[in-house]
């Protein structure tokens, strides 16, 4: 065999590896973490992407067994299609998610976020104790399991698609350290896309904590109110009933809605909440945003 043949390995993979060794090395290209800046956000507010706040992802559903979604298209506005896998999430779980995201936004997205469980519970207005800690752990698992695809349009043209090519979870993952009673939570950096272009609602946290226990519909409507700057807001009752995942008869929904609007008036989120008939003869909820 000639010297030339001895100098080159017979395997193509071996030759490729030899070429790589003699080429100048390149520094690995890694993710550059970036902190998410949300104009107007402070300790007085919690932020939620508008497409999430307008959808039925979080809803004032009854306690107990939750509906399980498998590739379900959630109820939302016509400019967004949200496909969801996971259990139906409620308003208490919305509180947890908003608070975790509030802490995560202080760091580059993707970095581990330390969350003390007792501090988290107190911040969302709950007690501390074994029952609450178990509830929080179940919620962390539910939020980590929850997976969604968000597709948004503007004037009928594609505007945003998140979660189809790469999965998107409400929480990417977490680890609990019992010795420190602390969670280390990871948030997918793709959430930056859903908060982008100021497409987020600022929820007044102090007012949310003042909403009475059992008034989850009021909490859900507070999030909806925050998605629009319009001074007077109108929502068809049929649309609102579906958005709130309220499956009892309309007559019961009207009563519950009146109570929720009164609660939001009490904590000064809205004013002059009422149900009236529009020019098409359809019932709608109307209120002024404060």
Language-model features and meaning:
Residues 1-290:
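Charged, alpha-helix-forming regions
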């Amino acid at each position: 065999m000639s010297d030339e043949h001895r100098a080159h390995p017979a395997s193509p993979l071996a030759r490729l590896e030899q070429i790589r060794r003699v080429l100048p090395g390149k520094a690995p290209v890694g993710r550059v973490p970036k902190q998410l800046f949300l104009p107007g956000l402070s300790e007085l507010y919690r932020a939620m992407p508008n497409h999430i706040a307008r959808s039925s992802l979080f809803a004032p559903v009854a306690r107990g067994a939750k509906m399980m979604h498998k590739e379900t298209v959630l109820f939302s506005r016509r400019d967004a299609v949200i496909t969801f896998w996971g259990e139906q999430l409620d308003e208490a779980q919305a509180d947890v998610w908003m608070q975790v995201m509030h802490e995560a936004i202080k760091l580059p997205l993707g970095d581990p976020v330390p969350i003390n469980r007792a501090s988290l519970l107190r911040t969302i207005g709950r007690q501390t104790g074994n029952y609450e800690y178990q509830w929080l752990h179940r919620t962390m698992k539910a939020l980590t399991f929850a997976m969604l695809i968000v597709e948004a349009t503007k004037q009928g043209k594609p505007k945003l698609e998140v979660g189809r090519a790469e999965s998107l979870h409400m929480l990417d993952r977490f680890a609990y350290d019992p010795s420190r009673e602390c969670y280390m939570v990871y948030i997918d950096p793709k959430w930056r896309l859903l908060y982008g272009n100021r497409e987020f609602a600022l929820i007044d946290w102090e007012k949310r904590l003042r909403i009475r226990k059992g008034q989850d519909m009021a909490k859900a409507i507070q999030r909806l109110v925050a998605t629009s700057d319009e001074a007077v807001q109108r929502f068809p009752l049929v649309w609102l009933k579906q958005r709130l995942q309220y499956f009892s008869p309309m007559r019961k929904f009207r009563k519950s809605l009146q109570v929720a609007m009164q609660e939001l008036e009490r904590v000064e989120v809205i004013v002059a909440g009422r149900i009236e008939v529009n020019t098409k003869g359809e019932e709608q909820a109307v209120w002024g945003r404060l």
